[in-house]
């Protein structure tokens, strides 16, 4: 990479579309539901149904989505994903009018640009497949690791694959992952207690320290399963203490809490020496509530050993968990796994409006996966013949590729567009016919009037 880089800070949702760059953020209620399903299956800490900002810096997921670059504010407490190497320090250009002038990002001037050494191409291939049913038996961090080894295919598609029957593709049911779950201890600070998988928080911003020994060269995850938050009006706990007070004092206290409502948003912060992450979930009666109860928080990669992390509870209340796990993911085999996926990949890629094309050459049957979200509007042509499009890894387009050299073309058309145009044309034609008939029957009151 050569030359100067600049970044325009107009921080807003859908910034990638606004600035005409490829990105991992979206805020659109009519967006691709498969992408949201993927984020949910990965238990990503995104907290709304129609909005997401990246993939929580999870290195494997970034590579699987062909992410090449990563931007970080210089000096920020931000753990850089594994495999991303700094290539440039860049400057911020003049900000846009709608930027938040009070934000730290607006006021910052220097950023570091990193390049992913393990980014996968737009089309890469698998030798192994795993059914969705077998895949769902693993937790979300294990699932992330499995995606580097086997393609996830819907159960009915696995049964119909001739490549599995003839031994060209291998169906796996039991996968060994590069993850471990170290033991941990929870040390409560002031204003919080922990008992039977439940945190009782008596004051805002109370903290616990989770002590655990983490190996070096690992990515550290916190897995919250069955997360539930409850709280009640503080007035309920003051009934006994109010009995000896005067009516005036009782009224003052009662008036203070009469309009009390539970928090709109529930905040948890996770901190290590090198990373800071925030998790937000919402009250059940709000439009932003997702119904999700499982969350994974990535505390980043570190080439040194770690001894633990802090959790800060932003709200008073009761936080119940079915299970809390600390999971570390090793990268000892990461490079080898990435190279296996890109060994046979799509080359000579051409991107035009609604069309993606490329070449692929393989000496055995492979499952080709595109880092493009699946949508029924896509059609696939291999050597000019229309072929079956599969949903792979819950979110991507895919297809079985037979041995040989092939030209692969993807074409997109908005689902229902053709029939919509036909129906619209018929409707307009019928409207004109009705208008002409009405005009002939009622010449004194024509619908279609000539210009005078």
List the predicted regions and their residue ranges.
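Conserved luminal/periplasmic juxtamembrane motif of membrane-embedded glycan-processing enzymes
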Residues: 1-189, 201-205, 260-276, 287-320, ...
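Active-site-proximal, structured, solvent-exposed surfaces of multi-pass membrane proteins
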Residues: 168-452
């Amino acid at each position: 990479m050569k030359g100067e880089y600049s970044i325009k800070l107009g921080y807003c949702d859908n910034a990638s579309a606004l600035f005409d760059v490829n990105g991992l953020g979206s805020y659109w209620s009519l967006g691709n539901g498969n992408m949201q399903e993927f984020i949910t299956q990965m238990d990503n800490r995104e907290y709304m149904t129609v909005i997401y900002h990246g993939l929580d810096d999870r290195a494997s997921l970034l590579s699987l989505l062909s992410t090449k670059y990563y931007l970080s504010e210089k000096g920020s407490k931000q753990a850089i994903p594994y495999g991303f190497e700094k290539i440039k320090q860049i400057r911020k250009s003049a900000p846009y009018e709608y930027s938040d002038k009070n934000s730290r990002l607006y006021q910052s001037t220097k950023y570091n640009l990193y390049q992913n050494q393990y980014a996968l191409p737009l089309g890469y291939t698998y030798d192994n497949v795993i059914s969705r049913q077998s895949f769902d038996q693993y937790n979300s961090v294990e699932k992330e690791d499995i995606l580097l080894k086997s393609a996830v295919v819907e159960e009915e598609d696995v049964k119909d694959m001739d490549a599995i029957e003839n031994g060209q593709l291998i169906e796996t049911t039991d996968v060994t992952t590069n993850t471990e779950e170290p033991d941990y201890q929870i040390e409560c600070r002031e204003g919080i207690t922990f008992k039977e998988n439940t945190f009782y928080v008596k004051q805002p911003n109370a903290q616990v320290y989770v002590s655990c020994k983490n190996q070096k060269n690992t990515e550290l995850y916190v897995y919250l399963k069955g997360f539930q938050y409850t709280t009640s009006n503080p007035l309920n706990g003051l009934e006994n203490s109010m009995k000896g007070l005067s009516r005036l004092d009782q009224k003052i206290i009662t008036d203070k809490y009469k309009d009390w409502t539970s928090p709109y948003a529930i905040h948890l912060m996770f901190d290590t020496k090198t990373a800071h992450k925030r998790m937000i979930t919402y009250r059940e009666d709000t439009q932003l509530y997702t119904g999700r109860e499982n969350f994974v928080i990535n505390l980043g990669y570190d080439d040194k050993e770690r001894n633990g992390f802090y959790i800060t509870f932003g709200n008073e209340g009761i936080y119940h968990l079915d299970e809390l796990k600390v999971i570390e993911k090793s990268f000892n085999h990461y490079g080898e796994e990435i190279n296996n996926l890109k060994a046979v990949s799509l080359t000579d890629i051409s991107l035009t409006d609604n069309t993606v094309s490329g070449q692929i050459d393989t000496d055995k049957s492979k499952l080709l996966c595109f880092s493009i979200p699946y949508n029924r509007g896509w059609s696939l042509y291999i050597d000019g013949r229309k072929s079956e499009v599969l949903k792979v890894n819950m979110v991507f387009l895919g297809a079985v590729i037979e041995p040989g050299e092939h030209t692969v073309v993807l074409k997109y058309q908005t689902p229902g567009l053709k029939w919509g145009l036909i129906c619209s044309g018929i409707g307009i034609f019928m409207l004109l016919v009705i208008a002409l008939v009405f005009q002939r029957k009622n010449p004194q009151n024509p619908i279609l009037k000539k210009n005078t």
